[in-house]
Regions:
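Hydrophobic transmembrane alpha-helices and immediately adjacent juxtamembrane helices
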Residues: 1-273
């Protein structure tokens, strides 16, 4: 098989070559080479959520009593917040990578125009950029989980599933974030992105349970994508399972699929028309 021959796969059989050529890994390789010269920037992303976690352990954790966790069992406030911070970290990292970086590659560097001049399709670009966000988020998730383990915040063997859930959260938000980036016209419009991300971080039960809200507001909060990621992680962290977890999982999978479809269509329309 030569370098220009497409690799076999289901998508290659059902999608036209102009949309998908099976070379998303080449986009990931490009990102790896680019960040090999900026490894300090790459590594620094893991510290922000860790600082939050340490602040809660040293400060708030000593001031707040145990709270009621999933399944009605008591848990320390730090253990309650830790899975939510991991989910928030996956969201923030994915949104940052898939909006700022993608915007400048798309609007100024014209990176994607150059890519599409090669045997690479818009879906390859979308999958490659999203996969890079997921890879980066996965490394951060492993580091965060290791700190949780060292701080004694992991009480169930099921908590190891926090890492794949973090990858799913990163994929979903990266896909949606990349789609949004294609609509931006100037750097000042990134404020709109933060206007959506910040309320989700603050109000998606990150720091307190859903029951603190009035009934009407609970419905609004339950529409937030981050809420579903946090609830899924929080239950896995203590080994509690219920039917609602399937709903949380389905929501994130649907969001990921919708975002991937949206960004591939946008790139096709903007770069191939």
């Amino acid at each position: 098989m030569t370098a220009l021959e497409p690799r076999p796969g289901v998508l290659l059989r059902v999608l036209p070559p102009s949309l998908y050529a099976g070379r998303a890994s080449k986009v990931v390789e490009r990102s790896m080479l680019a960040y090999s010269r900026m490894w300090l920037v790459f590594v620094s992303g893991v510290f922000e959520p860790l600082f939050y976690l340490l602040a809660f352990q040293v400060g708030f954790g000593r001031l707040v009593d145990d709270v009621v966790g999933p399944g009605g069992q008591p848990m320390s406030y730090v253990a309650f917040v830790a899975p939510a911070l991991l989910a928030s970290s996956a969201m923030n990292g994915a949104v940052l990578d898939s909006t700022y970086n993608v915007f400048f590659k798309f609007r100024y560097a014209k990176t994607y125009d150059a890519m599409l001049a090669t045997p690479i399709g818009p879906l390859d670009v979308a999958l490659g950029e999203i996969s890079w966000c997921v890879l980066r988020g996965g490394l951060y998730a492993v580091a965060f989980f290791a700190v949780m383990l060292g701080m004694g915040l992991v009480t169930s063997a099921w908590a190891v599933l926090l890492i794949p859930v973090a990858l799913l959260i990163a994929f979903a938000f990266a896909a949606v974030g990349m789609t949004c980036a294609t609509f931006l016209r100037s750097p000042s419009q990134f404020d709109y992105i933060q206007l959506a991300v910040m309320p989700m971080f603050l109000f998606s039960t990150t720091f307190y349970p859903l029951t603190v809200y009035p009934e009407a507001l609970r419905v609004v909060v339950q529409c937030f994508p981050l809420y579903h990621g946090i609830e899924l992680m929080r239950k896995l962290s203590v080994g509690v399972f219920d039917v609602a977890m399937l709903g949380h999982l389905a929501y994130l999978l649907a969001l990921a699929a919708l975002g991937l479809w949206g960004v591939s269509r946008r790139l096709s329309r903007l770069l191939l028309s």
